[in-house]
Amino acid sequence: MKKLLALAVIAPLLISCSSSTKKGETYNEAWVKDTNGFDILMGQFANNIENLWGYKEVLIAGPKDYVKYTDQFQTRSHINFDDGAITVETIAGTEPTAHLRRAIIKTLLMGDDPTSVDLYSDVDDIKISKEPFLYGQVLDNTGQPIRWEGRATTFADYLLKTRLKSRSNGLSIIYSVTINLVPNHLDKRAHKYIGMVRQASRKYGVDESLILAIMQTESSFNPYAVSHADALGLMQVVQHSAGKDVFRSQGKSGTPSRNFLFDPASNIDTGTAYLAMLNNVYLSGIENPTSRRYAVITAYNGGAGSVLRVFSNDKIQAANMINRMSPGDVYQILTTRHPSAESRRYLYKVNSAQRSYRRR
């Protein structure tokens, strides 16, 4: 569903999300400073959009939504990786179809390097790639995939002639074109990362199906994934919590950079390393592997401490309580009694996705 976030809603959301220590429970002053700075940046960014597009038309990139503004924030491209749809829109007062045409072509031909694109500015930094990220995920009006600029241009012209729509936001007219992704777009994106997933699986001893399920739930295999908590990349790793924990376990100082976490291979490696830490260190006292897997999944979203506190404030006693339960009872408790509604839903989503990957 399209994420239309008004600025009044965004501000408290940013504060609450950024104060969470999701995917790790490390807390330090640097993390607070970085997060507060990110909140300010996001507030200013949302304000710029609201001033031009209107209160109900604020649209910002998220874990499963690529949103890029250009033309002094007058044109935007939105890929909804959940719904499988691309929407290109403009409020340009002069030659709106020219603005749409250019944005359609660049969106269809953009590469898969998130480090080259700033989603929080209107800088037109989208580079046309010989290996477009959306290749095979979009077919033109003749049923062909789009790799070259000539085919993308022809398709853009076709779309502007046959699918151009307009609506008013109270400030100006919004012109838009929507393109559907192919039905199996999720599988096509997942296929890009299978090799990296297998490598990380062997390296850390984490089941491939779990890694894929986490990626699907976190980002829908969107390498450009960002969040209001500043979680980054395919597995939505936060630099100053899970990222720092993994670096420390590997004998590295500091935290992974944004560019590091936007690199798909590095992101998958770091996210998988953190899953291994949860399984082998933080939650190792849970004896039944299925019960421990449920705990690991929930902890990847909300932290190991919050999982154990569902059962007892004492970590050892919590593990002992879990060990006396059946895996089904552990699942039931985590999906109904965890204090975070997001974490309760998360276990259900990841577990369901993992079952589907195991059947393949």
Curated annotation (Swiss-Prot):
Signal peptide (from-to): 1-16
SUPFAM superfamilies: Lysozyme-like (SSF53955)
Origin: domain of life: Bacteria
GO cellular component terms given for this protein: cell outer membrane
A Pfam match: Mltc_N
Reactions mediated catalytically: Exolytic cleavage of the (1->4)-beta-glycosidic linkage between N-acetylmuramic acid (MurNAc) and N-acetylglucosamine (GlcNAc) residues in peptidoglycan, from either the reducing or the non-reducing ends of the peptidoglycan chains, with concomitant formation of a 1,6-anhydrobond in the MurNAc residue
Family (UniProt): Belongs to the transglycosylase Slt family.
Function summary: Murein-degrading enzyme. May play a role in recycling of muropeptides during cell elongation and/or cell division.
Protein name, UniProt field: Membrane-bound lytic murein transglycosylase C
Gene this chain is encoded by: mltC
